[in-house]
From Swiss-Prot:
One of its GO terms (molecular function) is NADH:ubiquinone reductase (non-electrogenic) activity. It comes from the Bacteria. One of its GO terms (cellular component) is plasma membrane. InterPro entries: NADH-Q_OxRdtase_suN/2, ND/Mrp_TM. This is NADH-quinone oxidoreductase subunit N. Keywords: Cell inner membrane, Cell membrane, Membrane, NAD, Quinone, Translocase, Transmembrane, Transmembrane helix, Transport, Ubiquinone. Belongs to the complex I subunit 2 family.
Length: 485
């Protein structure tokens, strides 16, 4: 097989992040320096983002039988890189006074980013599986990075065991699909699964197992049990990555799979997805109502957000609006989550004990840090889907898609779930403006806004507001990022 310059350009983001992994590894071997390794990581991720401009100058192409680079892949590569950049930036201040080795953190983030980029380009079940494993394996180390704290270690072990079980389900499902169809590329599966062929028992079993594996990775009900514990136990910057990059990359490949291989034509699969979506929306929101830990609350709310996104998966036959809805919702969710977890990261440090994730830590924050409180308020409003924030645009798209596809039960569940969600997001907001307790158990650095993490949080808040008022520029970009069949 010959590699042409065009193919190399199409793979630029993947190659640049892969090269950054090697450079950071050599830098650690040569000399441990936290600042240098962070800088190398950030430069590598920024170069990968810039390289998307050159990728965009080319036609969509199959670089290899496993990888297809088009505008759709570019959009999600961009979102994954932004999430990874935010994670690396928050990690710098979080790790500043970390007593053990700091540099490996960035190495693990970069390897997981390579997995996310591969998933965004995957058009074959083999690259889907490799991408998911490349994304998941570094997370075992990242979740347990604060291993001196029992919660972090427990979360890592829990995630590792359950993730291994989910991966085995997924692999067995892929094997069953291969046994029946003889090919694993999405396009070939699309041809083979057409008409009555999709009702074969082996095909249905394979699809069922694939749904189990992917449902775990996306933390959908009933495969969600790890989510609150892992979000709570993981260091705050890792929770940012878990909530954003891993979900975005996996959902991107799932949408491509469902568009190219008409899986949603199976009535049984659509029914299963509808039940999972309604259960995720209601369970995620109801469980979040009673939480006093902000990371657990955001963990449960992420279950509900993925439930809302399943509306687009069930309505995938209307695929142009489906793809647009997913792009807009995930972009809004990305910026809102970066802001919310960023505030938690800024208030946390591994040498002070566990992260500042109790709601009590945020009580009266407004009276000490008014701008930080304003940022957190904007993020909660966006996650709740309140007008004038970008989160509202995403929620609006989901409801419009549900109505157009005549999915009345799902649309009703979105409305009910959003109403429940409003209550617990308001709880977080209200606690920020209550009278401050006399003994403040947490505080952020005085100059938080001039730190790199502070700037990322402020930019996220401004983007959420600006795109909430005038979302058209981003909508235009997302409309161009279509899957071309």
């Amino acid at each position: 097989m010959t590699i042409t310059p065009q193919q190399l350009i199409a793979l630029l983001p993947l190659l640049i992040v892969g090269l950054t992994v090697v450079v950071v590894m050599l830098s650690i071997a040569w000399r441990r320096d936290h600042f240098i390794n962070t800088t190398l990581t950030v430069i590598g991720l920024n170069l990968a983002l810039l390289s998307l401009y050159f990728v965009g100058q080319q036609e969509a192409m199959d670089v290899t039988p496993l990888v297809h680079v088009d505008r759709y892949a570019m959009l999600y590569i961009g979102l994954v890189l932004v999430a990874s950049l935010a994670t690396a930036t928050f990690a710098y201040s979080w790790l500043e006074n970390y007593p053990d080795n700091k540099e490996e953190f960035y190495l693990l983030v970069l390897i997981a980013t390579v997995g996310g980029i591969l998933l965004a380009c995957a058009n074959h079940l083999a690259s889907l599986f490799i991408g998911i494993e490349l994304l998941t394996l570094p997370l075992f180390g990242l979740i347990g990075y604060a291993y001196r704290q029992k919660r972090s270690l427990e979360a890592a072990i829990k995630y590792m065991l359950l993730s291994a079980a989910a991966s085995s389900f997924m692999l067995f499902g892929i094997a069953l699909l291969y046994a029946e169809s003889g090919d694993l590329s999405f396009a070939a599966l699309g041809h083979r699964l057409s008409d009555s062929y999709i009702y074969q028992p082996l095909i249905l079993s394979g699809l069922g197992m694939l749904v189990v594996g992917l449902g775990f990775k996306l933390s959908l009900v009933p495969f969600h049990l790890w989510t609150p514990d892992v979000y709570q136990g993981a260091p705050a910057p890792v929770s940012t990555f878990l909530a954003t990059a891993s979900k975005i990359a996996i959902f991107a490949v799932v949408i491509r799979l469902f568009v190219e291989a008409p899986m949603a034509d199976s009535e049984a699969l659509r029914t299963v997805l509808t039940v999972i979506a309604i259960a995720s929306m209601l369970f995620g929101n109801l469980m979040a109502l009673t939480q006093t830990n902000i990371k657990r609350l955001l963990g449960y709310s992420s279950i509900a957000h993925l439930g809302y996104l399943l509306v687009a998966l069930v309505a995938v036959q209307n695929h142009q609006l489906s793809e647009e809805t997913v792009g807009i919702y995930l972009a809004g969710y990305l910026f809102s989550s970066i802001g919310a977890f960023g505030v938690v990261s800024l208030m946390s440090s591994p040498y002070k004990g566990p992260d500042a994730d109790s709601l009590y830590s945020y009580r009266g924050l407004f009276w000490h840090k008014p701008i930080l409180s304003a940022v957190m308020t904007v993020m909660m409003l966006s996650l709740a889907g309140i007008p004038m924030t970008f989160g509202f645009i995403g929620k609006f798209y989901v409801i419009v898609l549900g109505v157009k596809a005549e999915l009345w039960w799902l649309t009703g569940a979105v409305v009910v779930g959003s109403a429940i969600g409003l209550y617990y997001y308001l709880r977080v907001m209200v606690s920020l403006y209550l009278p401050a307790p006399k003994a403040l158990n947490r505080d952020t650095p005085r100059n938080w806004a001039s730190t790199a993490g502070g700037m990322v949080v402020l930019i996220s808040a401004l983007l959420v507001l600006a795109l909430g008022i005038w979302p058209q520029p981003l909508i235009d970009v997302i409309q161009q990022a279509k899957i071309i069949l």
